[in-house]
Amino acid sequence: MENRKMERRQFIAATAAVLAAPALVAPAVAQPAKTATLRFVPQANLTLLDPILTTALVTSFHAHYVFDVLYSTAADGVPKPQMASGAEVSADGRNWKIHLRDGLKFHDGVPVLARDCAASIARWAKREPFGQLLDKVVDSYGSADDRTIEIKLKKPFPLLLSALGKPDSSIPFMMPERLAQTDPAKQVTEMNGSGPYKFVTAEYNSGSRVVYVKNEAYVPRSEPPDWGTGAKIANYPRIEWHIIPDPATAAAALQNGEIDWWEQPIPDLLPVLAKDRNITLAIDNPQGRLSVIRFNTLQAPFDDVRLRRAVRLGVKQDDYMRATFGDDLTLWRTCFSMFPCGTPYETDEPDAMPGDYEAARKALKDAGYVGQKVVIINPTDFPAIHPQGLVTADMLKKIGMNVDFQEIDWGTLVQRRANREPVDKGGWSIFHTFGSAVGWSNPAVNGVIRGQGAAGWYGWWESAKAEQLAQDWLDAPDPARQKAIATELSRYAMEELPFVSVGQWFGKTAYRNTITGVMPGMAPYPWNVRPA
């Protein structure tokens, strides 16, 4: 850890010098007060475009531009109509009708029909954990007429609108029926949505640039914007995503007016940016995000729960958070819970993660570990994740594991993590990721705590008990019973360990004062942002 602290100090000093230097020779390049293009730097490169195929947040953010949703969640946590004008449910709770509002068209000019939405819901429900719970009780996804989606159920599903309005990744975005009929394990072939921006295929260059242009035919709602709900007004004719993996380069571009908005600056650079009167810093997601070690429970060595428990014993959350987010305690906290802290189902089990290397070594020995290779895949171009892989590799070596640390770019990682083969055939043992507190707040939406096996999220933890508890939570008659079930699931997962929490953090976004209207929420929403 001391070496990492020295590297951090050297990095801060060197970067500060680089960022300060231009100001000594020339003033920052001023961006015009009114501009036709918003220039944005996302958290990572965009390699997969289909928001149903992948849970990568950057893909979900991209999808907010191109596609739209029937329902979305506001800051109060309540799902509200978006493409829908409203919904009705039969007295027995088994027949839902969702009505489409006026003016909905896909980017090719074809009207959005109920059958497009029914097919989109059906595809999403095969892939996403909350949707899979819904899918088990669905008789049919269909349409009563061109403007009315009809979902017939085998039994009531009171949280249907919450499922359709989930706010994080794997959101049920609506697509034309012909695209929605694509195998959910394969990427759709075109980006034809009904959202406020159109994807410019000819200018897409993964690793460099993504371009969107305003959808002039989009009809916004009349309500004020609130997270993913309300009026999605596209104030810029053109938005460019600039992929800049080097933080110092991104910071300099922001200071010099070469970009307008940097989604996720690294904490080391926040003090430098805070001194620039032309830049605003703001918390982007008030509930925060939970960072985790994700195990491949399908293959050795972490198919053995005893080895996963040994790793948990060695985890020191402070090491992870300080390595990634520095010493500013307003940016992170420890969180000894399998559900994010600050959410209704938070538990506090610090004894489960004592950071005790001796105990971890003993646990490995008792489990009969004999040097099986542990492959960690770690993204070099994702600052909110990369340092955590270094901490884990260091810790595993210290407790006696045979570590093969493989650094790759994020785009490669999100594809490689789908490999279920053993490590000697290109598989993996560990990667690191994070999820929003709201997006992982309950058993239905939290894909990393679910035990769906091959049908579940990367890592493929299989647990009939976890799945039954998720179903029991969904069927519970009241909030008190739901909390008891969620607590049982959390404690069970802490023992079985599909993942290990390494801390919760609160990122800041940075933008030039030449733009305004940037909203907090679950994504860097493009609507409402406008020239100042």
Model-derived features with residue positions:
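N-terminal lobe/hinge region of extracytoplasmic solute-binding protein
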Residues: 41-91, 122, 192
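Surface-exposed binding/hinge segments that line
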Residues: 133-180, 185-205
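Structural transition elements
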Residues: 197, 330-366, 380-387
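Ligand/substrate-recognition segments at binding pockets and active sites
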Residues: 208, 246-247, 265, 343, ...
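Ligand-site clamp/hinge motif
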Residues: 220-272, 402
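Long beta-strand-rich cores associated with HINT superfamily self-processing modules
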Residues: 511-532
